[in-house]
């Protein structure tokens, strides 16, 4: 039996793990028909995906208006030519045999940098003050011992703002682009949550819910199956347009969600310092260059789940690479990034945020920090359950209330999003995301709310919930934020602190401590 067929059969066996329903509570799912896939299962499963190649791309027209932006100058993603994959290790710019001279990037923390470079935080020095906690100023110069040696592929691929649903998407209209492109996607539709949904609606929904840049998702779909600018070359691309080929997980919506999860894993794994290498389907492992940005690592990680190393190299660094197509479709990503980055400005701090229920009410802190949205996202969400009795999983008569003033920019699929800067864009500034808000009496989009205004009722609607509650998370400029990270989550003066595992944690205020407990015990009750 050929090696490729062995890889394929092993992949199918591992992929069956996705058919086992998750027992985790309070976890957002993609739809009622889709089982949630754990991060561990996703990592294990996708290492065994069969080898795949993109179809021949349809050249993007050279039009100068929507949907095609004129290609700009080459970005820093330009890579060495005529080099075999893995044959030319390169020391990152600014490094020597003994030390790296590293310029801090937006979103960097001392702890994450130390993990990426494989050193202890105290081994990193700078002529400027280095805080143990909090965000480092972008551009601060650090001297770091070189313990990783030479690394492969240090060149940046995409800026962070082109990977997440960031301010760079404010002037991008997904629907206009898709309909202007006149490819297969324009006529495609499928059932999602029991409702017929167009391909354009699917792309936009995945982008908004997972906070992944729609340009990236569209370019990926075109690169893998030619859906956006042309027609699929093979019938298999209809059922599995990205080629993940997970049994029972067919269709555009499910495949795009898998891709979004993988992008999320790479992006936030690098951001936190927990991801330092990638492993290909054939078992080859490479150390990631520690000077890369989160967006570039997200792309490297995603494509390592789709290709063995030679194919991965061609897809990211070859003459007809994914990045070449991305630029043909949307213009220079680095030029756009220059207009919106850094995503984390100097001195950024969370605005005043209140607990999501009315003053005087008693609720249970039923879930400590856990995944903000999906596998790979930071532990940015916390849960609150009304202490009003009633059936375990029902729509409560209690109200979820606005934790800060702002504009409701999204109210659908049991999610309410408040835009705190009021500009009407979820991808800019501070936003608060509430999940499991019942359909009944849920506030519509487009309404301005003040602190304590009612948003809707907590419920079990959407997700694998085992009890009535509201799930609450934050984003800034489209990036999910860790609840116990460099931008602390503080509600009504209570500081969120994570525990050892998902859903474990505390609320701290002075000498008081509330312990998260899904069962709603006395130690989890909090009164606002």
Give, region by region, the residue ranges found by the protein language model.
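Short glycine/threonine/proline-enriched tight-turn/helix- or strand-capping micro-motif at secondary-structure
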Residues: 345-348, 352, 363-403, 434
């Amino acid at each position: 039996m050929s090696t490729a067929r062995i890889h394929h059969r092993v992949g199918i066996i591992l992929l069956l793990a996705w058919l086992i329903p998750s027992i985790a509570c309070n976890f957002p799912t993609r739809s009622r028909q889709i089982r949630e896939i754990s991060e561990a299962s996703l990592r294990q499963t996708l290492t065994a995906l069969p080898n795949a190649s993109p179809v021949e791309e349809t050249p993007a027209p050279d039009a100068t208006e929507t949907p095609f932006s004129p290609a700009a100058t080459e970005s820093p993603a330009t890579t060495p030519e005529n080099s075999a994959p893995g044959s030319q290790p390169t020391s990152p710019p600014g490094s020597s045999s003994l030390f790296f001279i590293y310029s801090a990037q937006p979103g960097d923390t001392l702890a994450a940098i130390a993990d990426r470079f494989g050193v202890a935080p105290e081994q990193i020095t700078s002529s400027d003050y280095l805080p143990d906690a909090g965000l480092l100023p972008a551009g601060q110069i650090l001297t770091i011992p070189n313990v990783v040696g030479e690394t492969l592929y240090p060149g940046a691929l995409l800026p962070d703002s082109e990977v997440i649903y960031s301010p760079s998407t404010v002037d991008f209209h997904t629907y206009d682009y898709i309909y202007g492109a006149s490819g297969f996607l324009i006529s495609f539709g499928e059932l999602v949550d029991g409702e017929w949904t167009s391909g354009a609606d699917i792309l936009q929904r995945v982008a908004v819910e997972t906070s992944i840049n729609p340009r990236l998702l569209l370019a990926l779909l075109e690169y893998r199956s030619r859906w956006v600018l042309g027609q699929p070359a093979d019938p298999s691309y209809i059922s599995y347009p990205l080629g993940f080929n997970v049994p029972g997980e067919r269709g555009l919506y499910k495949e795009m969600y898998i891709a979004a999860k993988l992008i999320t894993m790479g992006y936030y794994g690098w951001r936190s310092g927990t991801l330092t290498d990638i492993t290909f389907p054939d078992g080859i492992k490479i150390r990631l260059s520690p000077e890369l940005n989160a967006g570039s690592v997200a792309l490297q990680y995603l494509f390592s789940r789709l290709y063995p190393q030679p194919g991965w190299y061609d897809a990211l660094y070859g003459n007809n690479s994914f990045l070449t197509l991305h630029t043909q479709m949307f213009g220079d990503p680095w030029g756009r990034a220059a207009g919106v980055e850094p995503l984390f400005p100097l001195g950024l701090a969370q605005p005043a945020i209140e607990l999501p229920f009315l003053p005087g009410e008693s609720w249970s802190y039923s879930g400590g920090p856990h995944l903000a949205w999906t596998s790979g996202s930071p532990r940015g969400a916390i849960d609150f359950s009304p202490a009003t009795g009633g059936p375990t999983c029902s729509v409560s008569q209690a109200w979820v209330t606005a934790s800060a003033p702002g504009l409701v920019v999204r109210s659908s699929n049991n999610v309410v999003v408040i835009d705190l800067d009021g500009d009407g864009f979820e991808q800019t500034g501070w936003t608060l995301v509430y999940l499991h808000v019942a359909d009944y009496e849920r506030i519509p989009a487009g309404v301005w709310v003040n602190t304590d205004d009612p948003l809707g009722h907590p419920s079990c609607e959407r997700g694998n919930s085992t009890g009535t509650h509201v799930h609450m998370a934050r984003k800034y400029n489209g990036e999910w934020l860790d609840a116990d990270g460099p931008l602390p989550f503080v509600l009504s003066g209570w500081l969120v602190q994570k525990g050892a595992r998902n859903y474990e944690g505390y609320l701290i205020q002075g000498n008081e401590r509330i312990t998260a407990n899904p069962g709603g015990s006395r130690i989890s009750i909090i009164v606002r």
